[in-house]
Regions:
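Phosphate-binding site recognition
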Residues: 1-434, 449-450
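A short beta-strand motif that forms part of the nucleic acid-binding face
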Residues: 43, 204, 471, 481-484, ...
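Structural motif
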Residues: 142, 474-476, 510
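Mg2+/Mn2+-dependent nuclease catalytic core
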Residues: 165-178, 482-499
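Metal-dependent nuclease catalytic cores in nucleic-acid-processing enzymes
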Residues: 183-190, 343-351, 440-448, 492-512
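Conserved catalytic cores of phosphodiester-cleaving nucleases, focusing on short active-site segments
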Residues: 442, 465-482, 496
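Domain-level recognition of nuclease-like catalytic cores that cleave nucleotide substrates
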Residues: 501, 505-533
Length: 533
């Protein structure tokens, strides 16, 4: 089987024998039930392939669709004038790059359809091209814009400056927003010349929207009819890749059901509508099946720089961000607010819908899967704590240590990690800041160990346990103190009976008291005790 990893050209996939998951019934429905759409999906989720498929369809390339659902659905294969604008691969942090990109695009189209001498701005010139294309072919124009938001995301919160035509200094971010708003405004005036428009991207901007200049597109990002338009459903995975899953199961020496469970925990969990259809991350699952290994493929391709910049302003506890219900207005429309980056985190694919409350039309948001949870928390921890070295190797060592039940080594690993955090990050003068740093630091560190079941501040009959980590062979029950003693922490675990619920559990139970010094910013006291309950 040939896996289309990194291939976004529909024609190449079909001509060269790569596997293609048939989405053309959804494409047919999309085309015949509206004409101006917007779709938001995370990076590497198949948006560019969708654009390429639509381009081939509207160009009437029927031979590429042989054997697919749309071959039977479409009775007329017409060749529409297609205008494909792709913002991928461009660096828009350079002043003038956006104008240059749009200028080149419009000039190329004018070579085909002619230039209207009365049109001066890029928007007016593009509108004239659309009109000429309609008149020349007798068919409405098709406009496909891939990653429409990249010119904004590249410069968002960078503080980069440029100069306007009058020599006034201004933010490059504002300049790009103005250019795009003017360019897209042509769609409203050119409505009669348009057959179909689709804009894809990661983020839907609000208030400062580039969409305000033209007919509001139909946002299908949370439309359950098109939830499977990008990504791989569980049904598609099991029907198309059954043999590959069996091969992975053999390699890992587990049953087929166990292998499906591991793939699901690692790469599944995306939901884009109230229907809660399970969608697998296509980039990760295809890489995993191809290489027959479970690894963090999507996260390794890099974290979006715009998100890293926004998180530098983020002052919320991640524990309070996840596992909560939100109205759609809180996470769908991004308002360029660095103090409330929830929409950016959600739309970038680091949070997803886990439940829908029909009565309040609100959504429970949480991490989609283990790959994303581990990667995102590690990214936030590195940004917040700024340790001297990347936490990745440290996390692997901690996971292996906890699998072995080595509490002494675990103490050394945790202590050394805290010691690696620069003093400037650890030093807190205000008591409230000391407490927040203490709590949030332990939360981030524990959350990075996502291979296991981690329970933070779990309520029990006798009180609230700071942290419980469950591994296949061991259960670790932690109580943390700040400027106290490990003995005091251990005593609390025993007196409150935090281990009581594991009375019938065959695993070894470890009770761990840990004291954190706000003076040094590190662990200065640790006591552990194995317990048979």
């Amino acid at each position: 089987m040939k896996y289309p990893i990194g291939i976004q050209d529909f024609g190449k996939i079909r001509n060269d024998g790569y596997v293609y998951l048939d989405k053309t019934d959804l494409i047919y429905d999309l085309v015949h039930n509206g004409n101006i759409y917007f779709l938001s999906r995370p990076r590497r989720f198949g948006k560019s392939l969708l654009i390429s498929t639509l381009e081939c369809y509207f160009q009437g390339k029927k031979e590429l669709f042989k054997g697919l659902a749309i071959e039977q659905l479409e009775k007329e294969w017409k060749q529409y004038p297609v205008f494909h604008i792709d913002f991928n691969g461009k660096n828009f942090t350079q002043a003038g790059e956006l104008e240059k990109t749009l200028q080149t695009f419009v000039e190329t189209q004018e070579l085909i359809y002619g230039r209207n001498p009365l049109a001066n701005t890029l928007g007016d010139r593009f509108m004239a091209v659309l009109k000429a294309a309609h008149e020349k072919t007798g068919l409405g124009a098709v406009v496909l814009i891939d990653e429409y938001d990249k010119p904004l995301l590249d410069v968002l919160d960078t503080g980069l400056k440029t100069f306007d035509s009058e020599g006034n200094e201004r933010l490059l971010e504002d300049r790009h927003r103005e250019i795009m708003k003017g360019f897209y405004s042509v769609f409203k005036a050119a409505d009669r010349d348009l057959k179909f428009v689709l804009l894809t991207g990661v983020t839907k901007f609000s208030q400062v929207s580039v969409f305000s200049g033209f007919n509001q597109p139909d946002d299908i990002s949370m439309d359950d009819r098109y939830e499977a338009l990008c990504g791989i459903t569980e049904e598609e995975l099991y029907s198309v890749f059954d043999e590959q899953i069996k091969a992975m199961a053999a390699r890992y020496k587990v049953s087929e059901d166990e292998m499906k469970y591991r793939l699901k925990r690692k790469y599944d969990g995306y939901h884009f509508s109230p229907s809660m259809l399970d969608i697998y991350n296509p980039f990760s699952i295809l890489n995993s099946l191809s290489k027959k290994i479970l690894s963090d493929f999507w996260f390794r391709t890099g974290s979006p720089t715009y998100l890293v910049r926004l998180l530098a302003h983020f002052d919320e506890n991640l524990n309070e961000l996840t596992g909560k219900f939100y109205p759609t207005s809180s996470f769908i429309d991004y308002k360029a607010d660095t103090e409330a980056p929830l929409p950016m985190i959600y739309q970038s694919g680091y949070l997803t819908i886990k439940e829908w409350n029909m009565d309040t039309d609100s959504y429970l948001l949480d991490f989609p899967n283990d790959e994303v949870k581990a990667g995102f928390v590690t990214m936030v921890a590195a940004n917040y704590l700024k340790p001297k070295e990347s936490p990745d190797a440290w996390v692997v060592e901690v996971v292996n240590t906890m699998k072995m039940g080595d509490c002494d080594k675990l103490e050394k690993l945790l202590t050394s990690f805290f010691a690696s955090i620069p003093y400037s990050q650890r030093r807190k003068d205000d008591e409230r800041e000391k407490e927040r740093y203490f709590q949030y630091t332990f939360y981030l560190v524990i959350r990075m160990i996502s291979s296991f079941t981690v329970l933070i501040e779990k309520e029990q009959s006798e009180g609230r346990v700071d942290c419980i980590i469950e591994t296949p062979m061991f259960v670790y029950i932690f109580e943390f103190k700040r400027d106290g003693s490990a003995t005091e922490a251990l005593k609390q675990i025993e007196e409150k009976g935090y281990a009581r619920e594991y009375a019938t559990d065959n695993r070894t139970i470890y009770l761990i008291g840990c004291n954190f010094s706000s003076k040094t910013g590190t662990i200065d006291d640790w006591k552990s005790k194995g317990k048979s309950v």
